[in-house]
A protein has these predicted regions:
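Histidine/acidic-residue-rich catalytic or RNA/ligand-binding cores of hydrolases
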Residues: 79-91, 119-121, 141-150, 160-182, ...
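Short acidic/histidine-rich active-site segments
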Residues: 71-78, 131-134, 138-142, 147-170, ...
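C-terminal helical cap
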Residues: 129, 137-139, 177-229
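C-terminal cap of metal-dependent C-N hydrolases
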Residues: 212-269
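Glycine-enriched alpha-helix->loop->beta-strand junction motifs that scaffold or abut catalytic
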Residues: 3-5, 65-70, 102-105, 122-131, ...
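Catalytic beta/alpha-barrel core
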Residues: 49, 106-115, 131-137, 156
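Metal-coordinating catalytic core of metallo-dependent amide/deamination hydrolases
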Residues: 2-113
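Intein/HINT protein-splicing elements and their conserved insertion hotspots or analogous self-processing inserts
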Residues: 258-286
């Protein structure tokens, strides 16, 4: 209803039992089928992580989902994921998913902090998309990924926040000696995601006459000049916080000057607070 574009999936695992897992599989596939030609919504097949997915479940998923339906999976976030896969007889978390025919060039593999040598080989061979989440990894104390071995990676937040500029700054500051020239970071932040997303939502991405007017204007007035060579520096150290002055999707203004023109923000906040209280009460009652 808000009008944003999204690529969505439901996290599938064995944690709630077989019947729930089968419902999760059905929902993922039906959502993907329903939105195959929708310019605003697309689906993927959501997987939690190797440690919560049995061999029987992965085999069932491989048989149930359309071959061309890509997966979104947490992969090698913590060392326990790598240890589990090796104990199961695989080289690592990517190798285990791959052995069930689930990895291709459209797969989204999230984290990839703890991988084996065969995992890196499969990533290179398939061109699967690796999404790094520096703030989440730091929060969970799981270590840092080997960026130099993941040349095609893009940036994410793991749902910890909705602030991608904050994630970009953390990525830069947590580099641990990695040289991060701005052109390479611009590829990670802008060009590579646009290319990847254009395969899911064709004809949407671009900044040229005739392209869909999907635009975010930051609430940032620079004191020093902005040039192509220092744009990323302004995003890292000047416009940090990611607060938008205006957001438009397909030319429709969704947010402007701290307000939703088409929605009552007070009503939305009350609904969000009510949902948050219900969730908190569920945890506290356990």
């Amino acid at each position: 209803h808000a009008g944003i574009r999204a690529i969505l999936c439901l996290e599938t695992s064995d944690r709630r039992g077989q019947k729930a897992m089968m419902r999760q599989v059905e929902e993922n596939v039906s959502f993907w089928e329903q939105h195959r030609k929708n310019p605003f919504l697309a689906g993927m097949f959501g997987l939690h992580a190797n440690i919560t997915l049995s061999a029987e479940t992965l085999s069932f998923i491989s048989r149930s989902k359309p071959k061309e339906m890509p997966i979104h999976a947490h992969c090698g976030e913590a060392s326990v994921d790598l240890d589990f896969c090796r104990a199961e007889g695989f080289a690592g978390p990517v190798d285990r998913f791959s052995s069930f025919g689930l990895i291709d060039g459209d797969s989204f593999l999230i984290h990839c902090v703890h991988l084996g040598e065969e995992d890196y080989r499969i990533l290179k061979e398939t061109g699967a998309v690796v999404v790094l989440n520096p703030e989440s990894n730091a929060n969970n104390r799981v270590g840092l990924p080997g960026r130099e071995r993941l040349p095609g990676h893009i940036l994410g937040t793991d749902g910890m926040t909705g602030d991608i500029l904050s994630a970009l700054r953390s990525y830069y500051l947590l580099g641990e000696g990695n040289k991060e020239p701005f052109p390479r970071m611009e590829d990670m932040m802008f060009r590579r995601p646009a290319k990847i997303l254009s395969r899911r939502l064709p004809g949407v991405f671009g900044f040229h006459p005739g392209a869909a007017a999907d635009i975010a204007v930051l609430d940032y007035v620079p004191l020093s000049p902005i040039r192509e060579s220092n744009l990323l520096g302004h995003l890292l150290f000047g416009a940090k916080g990611g607060r938008a002055y205006l957001t438009a999707v397909n030319g429709r203004i969704l947010w402007m000057k701290g307000e939703f023109p088409e929605h009552d923000i007070l009503t939305l906040r009350r609904e969000a607070q009510r949902s948050a209280r219900k969730l908190a009460n569920r945890f506290q009652s356990r």
